[in-house]
Regions:
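Extracellular loop-to-transmembrane helix junctions
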Residues: 2-24, 37, 45, 65-108, ...
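Residue-level recognition of pore/gate-forming positions within transmembrane alpha-helices
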Residues: 13-16, 53-54, 83-87, 131-132, ...
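Juxtamembrane interface elements at the cytosolic ends of transmembrane helices
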Residues: 14-30, 93-107, 171, 175-178, ...
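Loop-to-helix junctions at membrane interfaces in multi-pass transport proteins
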Residues: 38-41, 45, 62-78, 190-351
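A generic, lipid-embedded transmembrane alpha helix
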Residues: 39-65, 137, 304, 405-408
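Residue-level recognition of transmembrane alpha-helices
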Residues: 50, 79-80, 162-166, 185, ...
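Helix-loop-helix module between adjacent transmembrane segments
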Residues: 52, 75-174, 245, 263-271, ...
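Loop-to-transmembrane helix boundary motifs in multi-pass membrane proteins
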Residues: 113-128, 132, 136, 377-408
Length: 408
């Protein structure tokens, strides 16, 4: 990157830390303020934070790869999670039901649901440990994916890029809890939205896809195979019942496309009927009222819809790149995103784009860590290890738990 791009990224990172630290005083009263913002955060802040947390670099790269290789069929595959259909259940039913429980975590909900006897204790402990393990796994996924992407553009090793983002995000997450998380997410959401508008505008004004073109799919042996597709097939709105991916392709599992989509839809329905978990559920526990739980869902979903024009635009620019005689078809679909940024984003704008994608990574990371730490403090430490712990002690445990989760 050029010097101006690096300056933009550095200024952005410093601004994020400052915004987060400003919220430290509000989050230092007790664990309710640290993990739920005293249940006084506006619905639009919680909704914007949710959108930012749902948008991460690794997920954007994977979804772009699907759309690039499969067209709109990739969108249907992401019914498994990327489309976040679970928000429909949260908006209509589960969001307000979870908020009414007045609990802090999904594990504490187990006591609310099954009682405080042996069954409830068992369910709560299992839920707490499972949630902590999942938090560590998700943090690892986010950090590795973001580190590879950011390291390439900053010109440093992926491990150092990951470490940079982790240290900065942990600075305000540990200090200011959910207050710092949601307000920095709002700030980062502005960057993300700016990126969406710019890339979508560029794709619409630059790209005209021909009737037939080549894309590429990954193979099980690590190689890649170029395949021909048509514009009508790539952009068809209705999903087919079957696909014809090459034998030995990692996408071959989707050849029985209709069955795969029905399975994912059934899976999301089951998950939605039982409510979400992690940082998604935390936003509803923090809502001020049933009405605001519904409003934050609507706002969250509306903002998240803009993620897909961004992903489709990156995919279109990736195909456009392969049509250029100076280049060849992008072999690895997961390299579409960095390739487009490298070849099509001008100096200055590239700095804002990298900052926006770093914002997406950090917002997902900080939300996951803050929600995960609550399981240790509320469900294990306060409930079973030190029931009479002071608020000061619980706050200390919350900060230590955040650090330990990242260290693992």
């Amino acid at each position: 990157m050029e010097t101006i791009d690096l300056i933009i990224v550095i200024v952005y990172l410093l601004a994020i830390v400052i915004v987060g630290l400003v919220m430290q005083k509000k989050a230092s009263r007790d664990i309710d303020s640290y993990f739920l913002g005293n249940r006084k955060l506006p619905w639009w802040v919680l909704g914007a934070s949710g959108m930012a947390s749902n948008t991460d670099i690794a997920g954007t790269m994977i979804n772009t790869a699907f759309i690039y290789a499969l067209g709109t069929k990739g969108f249907f595959i992401e019914i498994r999670g990327g489309v976040t259909l679970i928000m429909a259940f949260l908006m209509v039913f589960m969001g307000k039901w979870n908020r009414r429980s007045k609990v802090m975590t999904q594990a504490e909900w187990m006591h609310f649901r099954f009682g405080k006897g042996k069954e409830g204790d068992t369910a709560r402990i299992i839920a707490a440990f499972a949630s902590i393990v999942m938090t560590i796994a998700m943090v690892t996924y986010f950090v590795i994916g973001a580190g590879k992407f950011v390291g390439e553009f900053l010109g440093i090793e992926p491990i150092y890029a990951s470490l940079l983002m982790v240290v900065l995000a942990m600075t305000y997450t540990v200090a200011s809890g959910l207050y710092g998380v949601v307000w920095t997410d709002v700030f980062q959401g502005v960057f993300i939205f700016g990126v969406i508008v710019y890339i979508s505008g560029m794709a619409m004004s630059t790209v005209t896809l021909p009737e037939e073109f080549m894309v590429s799919v990954p193979m099980l042996d690590g190689s890649f195979t170029a395949i021909k597709t048509s514009l009508s097939e790539w952009s068809r709105i209705t999903p087919p019942s079957e696909m014809n991916m090459p034998t030995g392709s990692t996408f071959e599992i989707y050849n029985l496309f209709g069955i795969a989509i029905m399975f994912y839809l059934f899976k999301v329905t089951l998950e939605g009927s039982s409510g979400a978990g992690g940082y998604m559920l935390q936003r509803y526990f923090a809502a001020q009222s049933d009405r605001e739980a519904g409003l934050l869902s609507l706002f969250w979903t509306s903002l998240l819809a803009f993620r897909w024009p961004l992903i489709a635009s990156f995919a279109m620019l990736g195909i456009h790149h392969g049509l250029n005689p100076e280049f060849s078809v992008i072999a690895d679909p997961e390299l579409v995103l960095p390739t487009v940024i490298k070849h099509y984003i001008p100096t200055g704008v590239k700095g804002f784009l990298i900052a926006g994608l770093m914002a997406a990574a950090m917002s997902t990371f900080d939300s996951t860590v803050n929600a995960g730490a609550a399981y240790w403090v509320k469900d294990l430490y306060q409930t079973y290890l030190r029931p009479n712990a002071t608020e000061k002690d619980l706050m200390l445990q919350g900060r230590i738990a955040s650090l330990v989760i990242v260290a693992f």
